[in-house]
Amino acid sequence: MSWRGRSTYYWPRPRRYVEPPEMIGPMRPEQFSDEVEPATPEEGEPATQRQDPAAAQEGEDEGASAGQGPKPEADSQEQGHPQTGCECEDGPDGQEMDPPNPEEVKTPEEGEKQSQC
């Protein structure tokens, strides 16, 4: 006779339907977004000035940039990395260095600023 162990397959449990919570009231977008456009323009401001400022700049810059070449780009070495203002290099092995031990870090003197990465 052979020993039969407990099966590892279990029948799936029936799913229970959970009703979504009821809406308390209408959601107002001005509570959640800073980019809400007003329904009507202000009286002292004509409607033509409410255009996208980026679109207006493209039209103005079109004539000026036609005579100029492409804008110079950053050094080819730094193109893939965003510039954070901290110019720390990787360690000697090409791997990032561990952060310094907080107990060993000296506090900078007053009036003397140091850049720490």
Swiss-Prot record:
Residues 103-117 have a biased composition (Basic and acidic residues). It holds the Pfam family GAGE. InterPro entries: GAGE, GAGE_fam. Transmembrane segments: none annotated. Residues 1-117 are annotated as: Disordered. This gene belongs to a multigene family expressed in a large variety of tumors whereas in normal tissues, expression is restricted to germ cells. These genes organized in clustered repeats, have a high degree of predicted sequence identity, but differ by scattered single nucleotide substitution. Their sequences contain either the antigenic peptide YYWPRPRRY or YRPRPRRY which is recognized by cytotoxic T-cells. This is G antigen 13. It comes from Homo sapiens (Human). The lineage of its organism: Eukaryota, Metazoa, Chordata, Craniata, Vertebrata.
